[in-house]
């Protein structure tokens, strides 16, 4: 019989290093406040940027979709699993993103694994920022293309790698739009310039930019005014959109090609009618108004400024993502536990999600937080920070 004790030993090692992830179970919907183990806590760690996860319009749309379409698609999309509702979501997303077409998949993670191996192979070169998301890294591995990893946000190093890859059949530059652990932005205008100079494609994973950056939350491409110059945009429907799923946005030819070649599209069922309808409603709300996006930024600005006044190191974030840098993994884990006791749910982030020695509490601000919520958080951060000798 297989000896499972090897896993037990590995788990003990993780605990000793302060790297073991303790999973808390929610007993309430997503929102500014959560109930966990019967305790009401302020939520500072979800990706529910705009509060859509428990938005009445989205819930109503999901319920109506279940009544009309049922609970599941029943097949993959190429056989009998494409509803007109699915097509409507893709059309509306394309209008929102100002692209020719989109294709949605089961998650943002899956979207990266769908597109990268579909458009590259061993004859090609992929140039990837060293801090790109795990889903990009896995997608690159699946493609079998030659990989060139460039220093984080360093366009000079990217150019050197492009020169090294000059003989590749096809060159694909991939970057996160917003880097989820630090909140910094990709230098997308400079990347696009290099891509045009060296005849490369540009792909940006905008999971943390959608609903956050650009007009009405259209994302980093809109933020920099680069419509038509970025070949592939990867989006998620599970963060600012508050639902589930991911999608690829770009030229019609690309999207049509993916519908023939992307394995997760061909061999896995699509989103349920409820998820599809809710995501569609979220897109419509963003098209109508950017009030929530503005509230998100106002909240983030206030919280960051006050945290810096208290003496916390909040890194170099350019977005509502606020890393509270503690560096030591055990300190970060203890800080998170102390915050929870004080009524704040803010998770510690350590290796392998971030490099060793870069542990932090990643604070995720939402449009649904009130000033009173933020002041409560600041009070508790100050208390715990002083108790643990951080400030």
Swiss-Prot record:
Any one biological process term the GO annotation gives: biotin biosynthetic process
The record's top EC class is transferase
- Cofactor(s) the record lists: pyridoxal 5'-phosphate
Q: Show the disulfide pairing.
A: none
Specify the pathway: Cofactor biosynthesis; biotin biosynthesis
Give the superkingdom in one word.
Answer: Bacteria
Residues bearing the modification N6-(pyridoxal phosphate)lysine: 239
- How does the record describe its quaternary structure? Homodimer.
Regarding protein family, the annotation reads:
Belongs to the class-II pyridoxal-phosphate-dependent aminotransferase family. BioF subfamily.
Protein name per its UniProtKB record: 8-amino-7-oxononanoate synthase
Organism annotation: Thermosipho africanus (strain TCF52B)
Name of the encoding gene: bioF
């Amino acid at each position: 019989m297989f000896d499972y004790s090897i896993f037990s030993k590995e788990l003990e090692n993780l605990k000793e290093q302060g790297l073991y992830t303790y999973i808390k179970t929610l007993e309430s919907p997503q929102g500014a406040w959560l109930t966990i183990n019967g305790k009401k806590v302020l939520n500072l760690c979800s990706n529910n940027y705009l509060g859509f996860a428990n938005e009445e319009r989205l819930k109503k749309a999901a319920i109506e979709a279940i009544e009309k379409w049922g609970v599941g698609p029943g097949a993959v999309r190429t056989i009998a699993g494409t509803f007109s509702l699915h097509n409507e979501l893709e059309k509306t997303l394309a209008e929102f993103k100002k692209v020719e077409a989109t294709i949605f998949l089961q998650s943002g993670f899956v979207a990266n694994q769908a597109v990268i191996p579909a458009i590259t192979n061993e004859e090609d070169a992929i140039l990837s920022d060293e801090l790109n998301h795990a889903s990009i890294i896995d997608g690159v591995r699946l493609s079998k293309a030659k990989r060139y990893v460039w220093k984080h946000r360093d366009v000079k190093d990217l150019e050197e790698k492009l020169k090294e890859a000059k003989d590749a059949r096809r060159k694909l530059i991939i970057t996160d739009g917003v880097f989820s652990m630090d909140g910094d932005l990709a230098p997308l205008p400079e990347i696009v310039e290099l891509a045009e100079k060296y005849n490369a494609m540009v792909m940006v994973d905008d999971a943390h930019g959608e609903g956050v950056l650009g007009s009405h939350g259209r994302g980093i491409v809109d933020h920099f005014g680069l419509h038509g110059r970025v070949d592939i945009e990867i989006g998620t429907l599970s963060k600012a959109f508050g639902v589930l799923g991911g999608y690829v946005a770009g030229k019609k030819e690309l999207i049509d090609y993916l519908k023939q070649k992307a394995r997760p599209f061909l061999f896995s069922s699509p989103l349920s009618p409820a998820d599809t309808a809710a995501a569609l409603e979220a897109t419509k709300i963003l098209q109508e108004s950017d009030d929530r996006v503005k509230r998100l930024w106002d909240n983030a600005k206030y919280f960051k400024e006050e945290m810096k006044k208290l003496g916390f190191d909040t890194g170099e974030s350019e977005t509502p993502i606020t890393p509270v840098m503690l560096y030591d993994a055990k300190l970060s884990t203890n800080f998170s536990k102390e915050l929870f006791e004080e009524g704040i749910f803010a998770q510690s982030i350590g290796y392998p999600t971030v490099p060793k020695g870069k542990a932090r509490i990643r604070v995720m601000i939402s449009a649904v937080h009130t000033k009173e919520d933020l002041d409560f958080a600041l009070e508790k951060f100050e208390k715990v920070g002083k108790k643990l000798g951080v400030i």
